[in-house]
Amino acid sequence: MGLPFKVTPAVLVPRPDTEILVQAVMDRLKAASSGGDESLRAADIGTGSGAIALSLLHYLPTLQMVSVDISAAALAVARENAAALELTERIAFCEGNLLAPLAGHMFQAIVSNPPYIPVDDIAGLAPEVRDYEPRTALAGGPQGMDFYEQLVAGAAVFLAPGGFLALEAGIRQAGAIGALAAKDPAWGRQEIIKDYAGIDRVVVLWKK
């Protein structure tokens, strides 16, 4: 992402794979604006250090962001990073669970890198991840799908026509996310984007 981010034990360390998610959202928001000067609005769910939201703001000067996290400690880190990058005027931070703080607002994009590690796999993670990064930012339920299910079920109502939901996916989860969306009449076209290792890493769902 090319920007410096402070991290603490309250947030995940930004991963190289997340650059794929940021680039995917940037490309699609740029296309949506058609090179014009109109303001764009996006929301980042589970913002953590703010790396995704702040990277988008840095590279998209007409973008306004809402960043949500259930952790007050994580939001404190994200606010520090926003101040250090001089981006505070274009971002609002909301403490709350997933999509709930978005009530009454509409966006061109919703982006999330949610917890997606199956609970039984946590013990097998590298010690520097398992022992030092917040479990709440890692564990995604029995199959790692709990947060994807909630986001796919609820995000469309907060998207403007032609808007999209972009999700970072764990290994072998992109297809399952697509299958969830295929059953939901709110979603139309799907895209799957591979990471640097050729793994399906980002799922983009377009609102009908």
For the regions a language model picked out, list residue spans one by one.
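Conserved adenine-nucleotide phosphate-binding loops and their immediately adjacent elements
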Residues: 1-7
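Conserved beta-strand segments of alpha/beta enzyme cores
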Residues: 4, 64, 90-92, 188-191
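Conserved SAM/SAH cofactor-binding pocket of Class I
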Residues: 13, 19-124
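Class I S-adenosylmethionine-dependent transferase superfamily signal
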Residues: 25, 56, 129, 151-155
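C-terminal beta-strand of the catalytic ATP-binding
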Residues: 116, 206-208
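Conserved Class I SAM-dependent methyltransferase catalytic core
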Residues: 142-206
